[in-house]
Regions:
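Structured extracytoplasmic
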Residues: 3, 15-181, 187-196
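Conserved "repeat-terminator" motif of extracellular CCP/Sushi domains
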Residues: 1-5, 9-13
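Extended serine/threonine-enriched, polar tracts that run as long, contiguous segments within proteins
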Residues: 189-191, 199-208
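A generic alpha-helix preference that emphasizes hydrophobic side chains
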Residues: 6-8, 27, 204
Length: 217
């Protein structure tokens, strides 16, 4: 297993062992308790939902920024950031943020969302673009074994078959919201499969997912 640090982003490569791997021990605990975690455990629920949809221009390097077509517009590159998942630079060109009150009833499989706030930047707040982008996105349950994007089924990193599809590395542990959590990195065992790469934080007692970052490989 090799590690390379890029702007505080640790990139893992190489196959990990399926034996004596503490990350897999934690993953099995997640499987055991996943029906006790997530929204499906409740008949009815209420929550506040924050949604951020973003279009980015990827791989912004120094040669790109020095291109003469950007002369006089160098200020736009102050927004360049680095992905925590891939370690690559990107420039946000469209962002829509929204805040909702969500009311769900699992007994009748119905969800109602009430928009409380909305903010759009880029493309002059073009509503046609926003509608197109939102059509590309859906709500996902990360505990599901498979997640569908663009009519293709991707294996979830939390899937019971994930152990055969992903490498898992226990990278860190820390307090999140006063709860001790483990940080696990995942990446594909093989190329050219419908998979993700990223990391997640999981509670050390309930084994509920606190936070997850994913990018399609």
């Amino acid at each position: 297993k090799e590690m390379q640090e890029l702007n505080e982003v640790v990139v893992f490569t190489g196959k990990t062992s399926k034996k004596n791997n503490p990350a897999l021990d934690i993953l099995r605990k997640i499987w055991e308790r996943k029906r006790k975690n997530g929204l499906y455990q409740f008949n009815q629920y209420q929550m506040e939902k924050y949604e951020k949809i973003e279009f980015d221009m990827n791989t912004i390097d120094s040669a790109f920024m020095k291109n003469k077509i950007f002369k006089g517009m160098e200020f736009i590159f102050k927004q360049v950031d680095t992905s925590k998942v891939t370690g690559k630079t990107y420039l946000p060109i469209f962002i829509n943020e929204a805040l909702y009150d969500v009311y769900g009833d699992n007994t009748i499989k119905k969800v109602k969302e009430i928009n409380k706030a909305n903010k759009t930047s880029g493309f002059n707040g073009n509503q046609q673009i926003l509608a197109f982008v939102k059509d590309l996105y859906s709500d996902y349950n990360i505990y599901d074994n498979h997640l569908t994007f663009f009519d293709k089924s991707f294996t979830s990193p939390l899937s019971r078959t994930g152990i055969d599809v992903y490498n898992y590395v226990l990278r860190d542990s820390a307090l999140i919201d006063n709860k001790w959590c483990f940080n696990i990195v995942f990446y594909p065992r093989r190329k050219n499969e419908l998979t993700f790469k990223g990391d997640f934080w999981v509670n050390d007692t309930t084994f509920a997912i606190k936070k997850i970052n994913m990018a399609v490989t």
